[in-house]
Design a protein with these regions (language model features):
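Sec-dependent signal peptide recognition
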Residues: 2-9
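C-terminal motif of bacterial Sec signal peptides marking the signal peptidase cleavage site
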Residues: 15-18
Length: 228
């Protein structure tokens, strides 16, 4: 008898819990159309463009006919956005940089800055014989593999990938998640220049995804995370 009462009590609790869960589910309607006129992705978009220029600069060494030597100071200046090193004046005058938002988790930021100097040594080695592989185990330089000509460090790691993929994780992903994790701390009452601080924060976090504001309807110009 006692076991029967206990069993009935447990069943009753389960039914009650099930009903309560159903009652607590939020109700919402999905909009049929969206308005993106006040979307502002400028901060994150500028950082994506800065990375693109830095990556393109390193890629100038990825050739079997030419052997440009990289400049470590230029790479560092681009990273800190000083001395007008970008080809786009909008980037130079933006007051935005990559370094101040790059996470140093696992020592990445320090490792990246060291790689700028290492890349100079590798590009100098590659310049000696621009049409041949100069990289080998323990020796940085140019690696020719099929139709690919890439600048690698002494461990065979591509400098472009250290920069590009590293910033995608240590800045774009890290900053987007940091913003979203603290989204409730942003003001969502006062409208300034067409958006609240919280709305702008959402936009900035979304911008690090590297897609148009009306993605996935529009899939033009996908960059970084958005291109995967």
């Amino acid at each position: 008898m006692r076991n029967s009462i206990l069993l009935l009590s447990i069943c009753g609790l389960l039914v009650f819990s099930s009903c309560k869960d159903k009652e607590d589910k939020p109700k919402y309607s999905i909009p049929q159309t969206y308005n993106f006129t006040n979307a502002n992705l400028s901060t994150s978009s500028i950082r994506l463009s800065m990375l693109a220029e830095m990556t393109a600069y390193i890629r100038t060494t990825h050739s079997n006919t030419d052997a440009p030597i990289l400049n470590a100071e230029k790479l560092m200046n681009m990273y800190e956005n000083i001395n007008n090193m970008f080809g786009d004046s909008v980037l130079n005058n933006s007051g935005i940089q990559l370094k101040d938002k790059t996470s140093n988790a696992f020592g990445f930021r320090s490792r990246l800055e060291l790689s700028f100097n290492d890349a100079i040594i590798a590009s100098n080695n590659a310049a000696v014989k621009p049409t041949e592989t100069s990289a080998s185990s323990g020796y940085a330089g140019k690696l020719i593999s099929g139709t690919r000509y890439i600048l690698v460090d002494s461990a065979g790691i591509e400098y472009k990938e250290v920069l590009e993929k590293g910033i995608m994780g240590a800045l774009f992903y890290a900053e987007a998640t940091r913003i979203l994790n603290t989204i409730n701390s942003y003001d969502n009452q006062n409208n300034v220049n067409g958006a609240t601080a919280q709305e702008h924060a959402w936009d900035e976090a979304f911008g690090y995804f590297g897609v148009p504001v009306d993605f996935p309807t529009n899939q033009t110009g996908l960059r970084n995370w958005g291109s995967y």
